Amino acid sequence: MFPHLKGHGQRVNLQLLQEAACRELLQQLDRIEGSKVIVLDETMIGPLDLVTRPKLFADRGIRLLALKPELHLPREVANVVYVMRPRVALMEQLAAHVKAGGRAAAGRQYHILFAPRRSCLCVSQLEVSGVLGSFGNIEELAWNYLPLDVDLVSMEMPNAFRDVSVDGDTSSLYQAAVGLVQLQRLYGRIPKIYGKGEFAHRVWEHAKQLGRDERTLYNGDKGVVDQLILLDRSIDLLSPLATQLTYEGLIDEFYGIRQNKLTLPAENFPSDGALPGGGGSGPRVEESQSLLGDTEKKTILLHSGEQLYAELRNKHFNEVTKLLARKAREIHVQMHATSQDKSVQEIKSFVENLLPQLMAQKKATSEHTAIAGLLHEQVNAVRFADDLAAEQEFMVCADIDKPSAYIEDLIACRVELNRVLRLICMQCHAASGFKEKLLNHYKRELVHVYGLEVLLTISNLEKSGLLHLQTESRAYSVLRKTLHLTVDDNVEIEPKDISYVHSFYAPLTARIVEHSLKPLGWQTLKSQINNLPGPTFEDFQAQLVGIGGRHTVTTVSEGSLLNVPRVVLVCFVGGCTFAEIAALRFLAAQEDNNVEFLIATTKVVNKHSFLDSLMSS
């Protein structure tokens, strides 16, 4: 169903995770007899697409609908199955929908599948609303980590960092721990665990306790994953705020990639001609219309199963335009090669076999050229260049202890608040906090222009650690030098260092992982990252020597074990960016490292979505 998840030579087969999630859903549906429709909370539409295809429901005669106030259900349907996030705020809408449906069709049965777990608060709210008796089954789908790509899984919880740091809701930490146990159930016990940060430590403590409860499932079974690195988002708040300069990162920042899908106005793309044959590797338009879709929009799938995108995604944007131009020339040469010296049989073979592939490659190149063109307009805008210059000055600690003239100009011009706050937070992080006088100066300026309500947002930023008073440690300034977070002579095309993802800044999280790969790396690293917030921890799980992982792709002899890359699971608690992911993929591509990464995150974020989650009420 999702062949791109298996990968080529990957030791961790994420198809197993997808199949387990799909199987769990079907088992729940099969327990419900009679005709049925599935009504989805809007935040569950994307996750559902990650584990199954619409055809699977069509084959079973099940319709998919989005939960909206104006939704009317078919009268003949006997069962309505709601698939929802366990959010109390949704229960009022759900109760109203059930009451309206009950009046329209007597005898109809309702069911709820909460993902990733059942909520007692939600059930209590349904009871208060007087509709609890209408529900036959109230179950849960243990969808913790969902596979986005061959090396990437996500909990799809965009507010996880805010929930924990601002609201004090630690349920996402528990779910991350449950997800780690689930991964070990599928792929075997992870023997070595390293981590940094308070929330990361709490995730591991939960996972360890849950693992003890499930000891019989994988006791002593050394799995395919050799090492786990847990990183708390709060140890590096600069990277999620920084402008990403990889192709994938820029797409996400300007247009948003949601569950591997990019949706843009169809007018931006060349019309789709009929392609001979069925082969090719171009970006595939999703077969089914999105439940929230717009017929004037075009949706393109972006994952490693699309060959051209896999080649472009982690490149610096300056390299992408050159690669696309070269690819277009190559296709043109192949398609217009002279046929004078070819036999009829050779021409027939070309038309039947090679031509469909070339047409698909041409379509993919054309579409990505259109996307790159849209990005080029954004990147060449004056505001983009000015903002980038300002944040890069902060990254090298230039004039970080006094008010920024650029930020003050933005405030005076009353630009959008997010844009101003992002730069203020970046300056604060680079300075390891503001002196009280400087922090109060910015607060006064913001209140004067944006009103008193801005203080509520500032309070959230202070609770989350994005704004705070200066500490004596000067952690960022020290780490910038000891871990080489900024590289002056960085190369963007065919780079030699991970700093290319931000042109000259290496994400701290990725640099920590890079150093941990070295012999005695974590032991050496501990003293360097000691000034970062939260504990530095390590743990080891008992294993039986010589027992292979239960889901390795290939079986290797003892003599060849040294040539097999070690598998490192890097888990971001609080979200990570595509730039950080690109940096880890760059490290995995270096032969000297002999490593394969599996990346887990609560959500893939960018500078806009990360800050927005903290600003919402």
UniProtKB/Swiss-Prot annotation:
Gene3D superfamilies, per the entry: 1.25.40.850, 3.40.50.1910, 3.40.50.2060
MF annotations from Gene Ontology: SNARE binding; syntaxin binding
GO biological process: autophagosome maturation; cellular response to starvation; compound eye pigmentation; crinophagy; determination of adult lifespan; endocytosis; endosomal transport; endosome organization
Keywords: Autophagy, Endosome, Lysosome, Membrane, Protein transport, Transport
GO cellular component terms listed in the entry, alphabetical order: CORVET complex; cytosol; early endosome; HOPS complex; late endosome membrane; lysosomal membrane; lysosome; membrane
Entry-linked InterPro entries: Sec-1-like_dom1, Sec1-like, Sec1-like_dom2, Sec1-like_sf, VPS33_dom3b
Subcellular location, record wording: Early endosome; Late endosome membrane; Lysosome membrane
Keyword Membrane assigned: yes
Family matches, as SUPFAM superfamilies: Sec1/munc18-like (SM) proteins (SSF56815)
Membrane topology: Peripheral membrane protein
Reported consequences of knocking out the gene: Flies display impaired deposition of pigment granules. Member of the 'granule group' of eye color genes as mutants affect deposition in pigment granules of two types of pigments, the ommochromes and drosopterins. RNAi-mediated knockdown results in late endosome fragmentation. RNAi-mediated knockdown causes impaired autophagosome clearance in fat body cells of starved or wandering 3rd instar (L3) larvae.
Outcome reported for the amino acid change (mutating residue 26 to V): In car-1; irregular clustering of early endosomes
Family: Belongs to the STXBP/unc-18/SEC1 family.
More info: The name 'carnation' was given due to the eye color phenotype caused by hypomorphic mutations in the car gene.
Protein function: Core component of the class C core vacuole/endosome tethering (CORVET) and the homotypic fusion and vacuole protein sorting (HOPS) tethering complexes involved in endo-lysosomal vesicle trafficking and lysosome biogenesis. The CORVET complex facilitates docking and fusion of endosomal vesicles during endosome maturation, acts upstream of HOPS, but is not involved in autophagic flux. The CORVET complex may cooperate with the early endosomal tether Rbsn-5 to mediate endosomal fusion.
Self-association and partners: Component of the class C core vacuole/endosome tethering (CORVET) complex composed of at least Vps8, dor/Vps18, car/Vps33A and Vps16A; unlike in other species, Vps11 is not part of the Drosophila complex. Due to the reduced number of components the Drosophila CORVET complex is often referred to as the miniCORVET complex. Interacts with ema. Component of the homotypic fusion and vacuole protein sorting (HOPS) complex, composed of Vps16A, car/Vps33A, dor/Vps18, Vps39, Vps11 and lt/Vps41.
Protein name: Vacuolar protein sorting-associated protein 33A
Organism: Drosophila melanogaster (Fruit fly)
